[in-house]
């Protein structure tokens, strides 16, 4: 069972890693077989794709994304908790509301993640 305290710890560490621009700390939350979906992937990667598969591809995507967003900052708005999943609601440096949902594997790493923007 995924509880509120575990979700809060994850969210705070995840947001801090992003705000510190620490790609290795960010990636430490994810399984090697991560599947990540975001409407931003196509713009950043310059290809008509909506998902990345695997930690190496995720590292490549986020390295480019961080380079394109020197003012990146995420502010926590709320956390929603499910049985083996959670959603972090946050406001980004562009003042956009973002909902990022994480589904965890049995080892507590993110196996699938979906980002949605207002």
Where are these regions (language model features)?
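A solvent-exposed, acidic/Ser-Thr-rich amphipathic alpha-helical stretch
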Residues: 4, 25, 31-77, 82
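Hydrophobic pocket/interface hotspot
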Residues: 14, 26, 34, 58, ...
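A beta-strand edge to alpha-helix "cap/lid" segment located at domain peripheries
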Residues: 63-118
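Short, low-complexity N-terminal intrinsically disordered segments enriched in polar/charged residues
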Residues: 1-28, 32
């Amino acid at each position: 069972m995924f509880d509120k305290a575990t979700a809060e710890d994850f969210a705070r560490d995840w947001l801090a890693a992003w705000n510190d621009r620490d790609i290795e700390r960010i990636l430490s939350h994810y399984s090697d077989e991560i599947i990540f979906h975001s409407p931003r992937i196509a713009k950043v990667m310059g290809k008509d794709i909506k998902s990345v598969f695997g930690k190496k591809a995720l590292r490549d995507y986020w390295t480019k994304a961080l380079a394109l967003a020197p003012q990146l900052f995420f502010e926590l708005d709320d956390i929603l908790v499910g049985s083996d999943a959670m959603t972090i609601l946050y406001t980004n440096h562009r003042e956009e509301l973002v909902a990022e949902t994480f589904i965890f594997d049995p080892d507590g790493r993110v196996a699938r993640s979906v980002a949605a923007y207002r």
